[in-house]
């Protein structure tokens, strides 16, 4: 449907072949220059999100590394952050130094989402955030995302479960064949309406 290229283009893993992405008339690069924080929770938790062989403390430090902060020098702040996440999100782990790759899928996702929202982002993109998780872990993640919405963050939820999308989203953008086939109100849209857009038999076509 074109979801992966959209994710990659938005967070700039790969440069887009055409078009542009803007928020309030500004590109992602311009937004970052203003100090507005963008966070991303990728679909591949241990491939793109976290380093499996590292503990929570070191994985917390990776976000600071992207900001140009001293790497592997200040360990107190990320360690305190890791300990706080363990307490607040009820992450089950032997300790902050235990490699995250040894944790269950639900706990790994809590670590990843917790790290990304700890920076108080203005825009938070999450891709399939509850895929493969049990029901309790899924609801924990949903709660965290809803809390971000309440705090004023723009949450971009990438997914395919229509029941979840209709429950969580204010607006739903439907992609088909790599193009936007419609944008609907999540409060009033139906699965049938969205399904037609997904198969190009309903809705318009946006470039």
PLM ranges: what are they?
Residues 1-207:
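Glycine-rich phosphate-binding loops of nucleotide-dependent enzymes
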């Amino acid at each position: 449907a074109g979801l992966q290229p959209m994710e990659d283009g938005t967070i700039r893993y790969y440069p887009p072949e055409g078009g542009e992405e803007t928020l309030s008339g500004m590109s992602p690069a311009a937004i970052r220059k203003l100090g507005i924080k963008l966070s991303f929770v990728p679909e591949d938790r241990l491939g793109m999100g976290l380093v499996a062989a590292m503990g929570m403390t070191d994985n917390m430090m990776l976000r600071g590394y992207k900001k140009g902060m001293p790497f592997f020098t200040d360990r107190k702040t990320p360690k305190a952050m890791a300990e706080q996440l363990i307490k607040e999100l009820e992450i089950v782990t032997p300790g902050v130094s235990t490699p995250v790759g040894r944790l269950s899928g639900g706990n790994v996702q809590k670590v990843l989402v917790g790290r990304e929202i700890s920076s108080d982002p203005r825009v938070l993109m999450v891709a399939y955030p509850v895929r493969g998780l049990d029901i309790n872990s899924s609801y924990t993640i949903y709660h965290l995302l809803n809390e971000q919405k309440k705090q004023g963050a723009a949450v971009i939820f990438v997914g395919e479960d229509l029941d979840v999308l209709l429950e969580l989203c204010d607006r739903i953008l439907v992609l088909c064949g790599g193009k936007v086939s419609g944008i609907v109100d999540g409060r009033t849209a139906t699965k049938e309406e969205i399904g037609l857009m997904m198969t190009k038999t309903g809705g318009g076509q946006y470039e």
